[in-house]
A protein has these predicted regions:
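Exposed, low-structure sequence patches enriched in small/polar residues
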Residues: 1-264
Length: 264
């Protein structure tokens, strides 16, 4: 066991772990390329009908040690599809660094730095094409009250820009607070409130603005949610969910639902 080794280098290596996942799914036209490709990494663009690629690598230092731990995530997704109206391509590349520090038994500090690039290309719908870069910093402070109750305070600053088309840009600030209350397995309550300030430059009625602002509006936005879960019996659960949002230019939107879940 390197963790209990007398050598410092072995102890250091025991704190490091890594997870890697790769998947590739593709469909080709045998009329164009009748040869069966035994190499899954070889891609013939001319005969390609559909393509889905995913790669994820997560590097941990001091995994599951809340006193201090570091997580670096690299994620890459790519896809291509041919439809009757033309072909589409999209990709998503994420580089994320997550630092977690347990200050004491009551407070946990988490800081996330994110670098993301999203691209979309449509053959016949030019207004859906974008090349978006997103840089963000996201500190979060968690206060624990008891074994199952906690409250989160968070702030997120994002700078987002589109390098093609109308070259839209967005500076978004998000202040949020969330509350989690749980009484063992009998009932649970989750509440969240968020304030967004979107400083957006570009056409607010475009597909690009919807993607960059996640469906929110230019200026000030407010979102809130409440979820209550209760266990009626060993085989029956009921959930009450309420969602709301408001902005300067759109009337308040309310959305609620009730879910009844039976376990057999």
């Amino acid at each position: 066991n390197w963790k209990n080794s007398k050598y410092r280098f072995n102890k250091f290596l025991s704190k490091i772990s890594n997870q890697f996942r790769y998947s590739l799914d593709k469909k080709t036209n045998l009329n164009i390329n009748p040869q069966i490709e035994l190499n899954p990494f070889e891609i013939d663009e001319n005969s390609l009908l559909a393509f889905n690629y995913s790669l994820k690598n997560v590097f941990y230092f001091n995994k599951a040690q809340q006193r201090y731990s570091l997580i670096f995530t690299f994620l890459e997704n790519k896809s291509k599809n041919n439809f009757s109206f033309g072909s589409t391509r999209n990709s998503n590349i994420v580089k994320k660094l997550n630092f977690i520090h347990k200050i004491n038994d009551l407070f946990l500090l988490e800081v996330i730095g994110n670098n993301q690039k999203r691209t979309n290309w449509s053959e016949n719908f030019q207004d859906k094409n974008y090349d978006i870069k997103d840089y963000s910093i996201h500190p979060k402070l968690t206060y624990f009250s008891g074994e199952n109750n906690r409250i989160n305070f968070k702030y997120k600053l994002s700078n987002i820009s589109n390098s093609i088309g109308n070259e839209e840009s967005l500076k978004q600030q998000n202040f949020g607070i969330s509350l989690f209350l749980n009484q063992k397995e009998k009932r649970g309550f989750i509440s969240e409130f968020n304030y967004y300030k979107n400083e957006f430059s570009g056409d607010t009625n475009s597909v690009i603005s919807y993607v960059m602002m996640n469906g929110l509006q230019k200026g000030e936005n407010y979102t809130w949610s409440f979820k209550f879960q209760r266990k009626l019996s060993k085989l029956l659960d009921i959930n009450f969910i309420y969602l709301g949002r408001k902005s300067n230019t759109v009337r308040t939107i309310h959305n609620g639902s009730i879910q009844l879940k039976a376990i057999f």
